[in-house]
Structure formats: structure tokens, C-alpha cells
Amino acid sequence: MFQVVKRDGELDEFKMGKITAAIDKAFDAKGKNYSSDMIDLLGLRVTADFQNKIENNRISVEDIQDSVENVLIQAGYSDVAKAYILYR
């Protein structure tokens, strides 16, 4: 797997659960109904979206967050994307 470069420069192992948890919280913030399968699918789409941004087996947390926003908007959840932006 690859590593995530955090804002403070520290490295952390990539964990899909962090992406899906953040998406889950954004849906909750908007009071939207969702299934865990849908959240998992959105998480997979996020990882596909940022694949080309991985360099030397590393990606920045900002690039991941940008991909979450892009995927939510593309999936028709612009209101959830706004909640995610506020959450991050």
C-alpha cells in the first residue's frame, strides 16, 4: 500500500476507513439517507480518482480530500461535498 503525507509532514499508512468515515459524517451532517455499500463505493471511486496523484508511493492528504470533493460532486452530492469541505 502507499503512505499519506499529513499536513505536518508526517507519514501515515493509507486507510480506506478514514475516507469512508469522513464521507459518512458528511452525509450525516446533511441528514441524507445512505447505505454502507454506497459509502464504500464512493470510497473506491475516491481511490480511483487520486491514483494519478500518487508519487513515490505517497500522496498528500490534501490530494485525497480534493478527490473526495470531486467524487461527491460528480455523484450528484454537491450539498454533501459542501458539508465535507466544512468538516475537513
Regions from the PLM with identified roles:
Residues 1-88:
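Long, C-terminal-biased catalytic regions of enzyme "large/alpha" subunits
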